[in-house]
Amino acid sequence: VVETIGLPNRDLFIFCDDTDYCLRAHIAGFSLYYIPAALMDKHKFFSSDTWTTRNQKKKWKRYYQLRNETYMSHHYGQNWGVRHLRGFVMLLGYWIPALLSMPFTNAWTMSDLPVLWRAYRDGIEEKLGKR
């Protein structure tokens, strides 16, 4: 696989690098196998945190998640809706709860909203890499 499609895309920092690699392998004609019994041992980063604390801790990851998922939809999408709207719906999925919770918690601030917009735009424009 590596000789045919190369290594995973390191510019998809944290999110979607595995999905992109599988899509590229599939497009190149390789078979993919789903192993439902496979396990991943993740560190319990949020185990005893409140909702507000969890949101604050993962704020920096949201940019990459939104950007990379928007990139995947834009890059591999087969129609305009997938290429442009899927990422925008995800953006709204962050904006709306943020706006609704701001008066009651400090998990979100107004300065978070432009960062999320930039993540969406960077995904559409296929600007990847660590930021």
Mark where each language-model region is.
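A bilobed periplasmic-binding-protein/Venus flytrap-type ligand-binding module shared by bacterial periplasmic
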Residues: 72-74
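A short acidic, glycine-rich active-site loop
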Residues: 53-63
